[in-house]
């Protein structure tokens, strides 16, 4: 009998007793009424903002404060008017140009990179005066990250602004500005998780000399009210998890319910999508356990039977599996059928075949990687990535994300998503590569298939540092291709934001290592800030 391997995973600090103890006082009609009153005041502010720069900065603040979802129609109208207006980009106002460029592109307007040409000299370099204002450099740097492939001006803008901000950062006297520059250089705004950015930015914005107290009050109140909603969702997920018995039956696996909820929150943050967040949390838990079965615990012969069970999608053949696999498969089978029933009941559409195909595809990718490991085979980088962007579960997560946030579900869109278009492939690739950067060293020590870093080292003979640099360059390409997606007209335009968010939460979790499998202080801090601690309000 082949010895079972162990991942020696750390226990989660987020047990059910602690989760059920979470409370919030920010519920009830009093807070709803106060919020509605503040929203009316903000709408008046939007109506009164007539200057283009004033409008753009207000939109930017609303987005970063985490309250722009209340004003989607007003923001869309404002940006459309700005885009259609005859006003030219002010030739010597780089802050305005960069902010306008970034916001319009984020909202799907294909603004050309040439708008930055007027800030470049005859030799094609940015003019020397640009480096005199740190805030302007930050605006340029942020704008440069919403580029697509082949945009040399934006590539130059990123290199130029990054170089000078890195040189300046330690000499910046203003503490708030210095912190902003450090955060920007760590991860640009375009790729940050919105709710985490809001938590930080509310406090940063409040210290500004020109901050608006109405915006501060609404942002804090809204954050606290949404946090109360998140707490209720997490409690329900935790009760479900305990009732499944999975924590006891799957003691060899990572048990990361709270982290899975944080993942779902970053992926689908809008408060009105609570149902989707709960489904996504459950699916992320089941994916994690299944991954550990394939990567760590399962014998190769068992894994073949497990994969065939997903292909058959038939509970009558469960007896062919060992008990731990039966429990895992049945949990997945039941959860898929429950979602399928709800969508059939509410929308008259049978999505069970779609879910079956997605789980079978994931299991095949897991099994191929397990065979590679057991046979001591190191694939080429391309071979690895052709499977690994699926085995990271991105396509499955995005499929569930579409199904749980779309009503009515469009059959044409569903069939298109099954073919894994770019809006599925590139967020999944970012998730895979970010995961590899954060986890590969530990996973190789534990015993796992070679990741992109090891595959590239084996293929080229380079050192680990060079391989990591190469993987980062692949992430950059994937991010640019995702940017291109939001500027394209296609059938499932509304799906773009969730797809982009999958990449954002991936970068967040693996920014400082394995923030999921081996939760570190940043993951704990993020959970506490979003789920546990409200803003203090008088």
From Swiss-Prot:
UniProt EC number: 4.2.3.81
Keywords, ordered alphabetically: Lyase, Magnesium, Manganese, Metal-binding
TM helices/strands, residue ranges: none
InterPro entries reported in the protein's UniProt record: Isoprenoid_synthase_dom_sf (IPR008949), Terpene_cyclase-like_1_C (IPR034741), Terpene_cyclase_plant_C1 (IPR044814), Terpene_synth_N (IPR001906), Terpene_synth_N_sf (IPR036965), Terpene_synthase-like (IPR050148), Terpene_synthase_metal-bd (IPR005630), Terpenoid_cyclase/PrenylTrfase (IPR008930)
Co-factor note (free text): Binds 3 Mg(2+) or Mn(2+) ions per subunit.
Domain of life assignment: Eukaryota
Binding site for Mg(2+) 3: 435, 439, 443
UniProt short sequence motif DDXXD motif, positions renumbered to this chain: 291-295
Pfam families: Terpene_synth, Terpene_synth_C
EC class of the enzyme, as a word: lyase
Gene3D superfamilies documented for this protein: Farnesyl Diphosphate Synthase, Terpene synthase, N-terminal domain
Homology family: Belongs to the terpene synthase family.
Biological role stated in the UniProt entry: Catalyzes a mixture of sesquiterpenoids from (2E,6E)-farnesyl diphosphate. Catalyzes the formation of exo-alpha-bergamotene, as well as (E)-nerolidol, (Z)-alpha-bisabolene, (E)-beta-farnesene and beta-sesquiphellandrene. Also has activity towards geranyl diphosphate, but to a much lesser extent.
Protein name, as recorded: Exo-alpha-bergamotene synthase
Originating organism: Lavandula angustifolia
């Amino acid at each position: 009998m082949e010895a079972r391997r162990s991942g020696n995973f750390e226990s989660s600090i987020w047990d059910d007793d602690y989760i059920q103890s979470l409370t919030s006082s920010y519920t009830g009609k009093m807070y709803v009424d106060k919020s509605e009153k503040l929203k009316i005041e903000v709408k008046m502010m939007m109506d009164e903002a007539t200057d283009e720069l004033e409008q753009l900065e207000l939109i930017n603040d609303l987005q970063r404060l985490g309250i722009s979802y209340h004003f989607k129609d007003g923001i869309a109208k404002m940006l459309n008017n700005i885009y259609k207006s005859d006003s030219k980009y002010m030739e010597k106002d780089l802050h305005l140009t960069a902010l306008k460029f970034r916001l319009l592109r984020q909202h799907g307007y294909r603004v050309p990179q040439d708008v930055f040409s007027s800030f470049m000299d005859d030799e094609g370099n940015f003019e020397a005066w640009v480096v005199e204002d740190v805030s302007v450099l930050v605006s340029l740097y942020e704008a440069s990250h919403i580029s697509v492939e082949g945009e040399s001006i934006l590539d130059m803008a990123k290199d130029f602004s990054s170089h000078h901000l890195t040189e300046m950062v330690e000499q910046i006297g203003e503490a708030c500005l210095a912190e902003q520059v450090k955060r920007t250089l760590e991860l640009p705004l375009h790729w940050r998780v919105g709710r985490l950015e809001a938590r930080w930015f509310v406090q940063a914005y409040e210290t500004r000399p020109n901050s608006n107290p109405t915006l501060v009050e609404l942002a804090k109140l809204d954050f606290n009210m949404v946090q109360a909603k998140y707490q209720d969702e997490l409690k329900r997920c935790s009760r479900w998890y305990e009732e499944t018995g999975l924590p006891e039956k799957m003691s060899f696996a990572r048990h990361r319910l709270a982290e899975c909820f944080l993942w779902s929150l970053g992926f689908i943050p809008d408060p009105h999508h609570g149902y989707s967040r709960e489904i996504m949390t459950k699916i992320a838990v089941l994916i994690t356990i299944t991954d550990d079965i394939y990567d760590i615990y399962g014998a190769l012969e068992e894994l073949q039977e497990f994969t065939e069970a997903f292909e058959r999608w038939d509970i009558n053949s469960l007896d062919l599996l060992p008990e731990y696999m039966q429990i895992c498969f049945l949990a997945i089978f039941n959860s898929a059928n429950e979602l399928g029933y709800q969508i059939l009941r509410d929308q008259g559409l049978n999505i069970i075949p779609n879910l079956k195909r997605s789980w079978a595809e994931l299991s095949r990718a897991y099994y191929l990687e397990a065979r590679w490991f057991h046979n001591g085979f190191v694939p080429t980088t391309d071979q690895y990535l052709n499977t690994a962007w699926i085995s990271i579960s991105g396509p499955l997560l995005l499929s569930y994300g579409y199904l749980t946030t779309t009503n009515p579900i469009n059959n044409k869109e569903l069939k298109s998503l099954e073919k894994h278009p770019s809006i599925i492939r590139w967020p999944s690739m970012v998730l895979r590569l970010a995961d590899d950067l954060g986890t590969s060293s530990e996973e190789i020590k534990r015993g796992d298939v070679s990741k992109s870093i090891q595959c590239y080292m084996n293929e080229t003979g380079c050192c680990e540092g060079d391989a990591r640099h190469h993987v980062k360059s692949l992430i950059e390409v994937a991010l640019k291709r995702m940017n291109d997606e939001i500027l394209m007209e296609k059938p499932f335009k509304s799906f773009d934001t969730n797809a982009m968010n999958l990449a954002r939460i991936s970068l967040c979790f693996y920014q400082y290592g394995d923030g999921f499998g081996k939760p570190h202080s940043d993951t704990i801090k993020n959970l506490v800030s979003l789920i546990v601690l409200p803003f203090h309000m008088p």
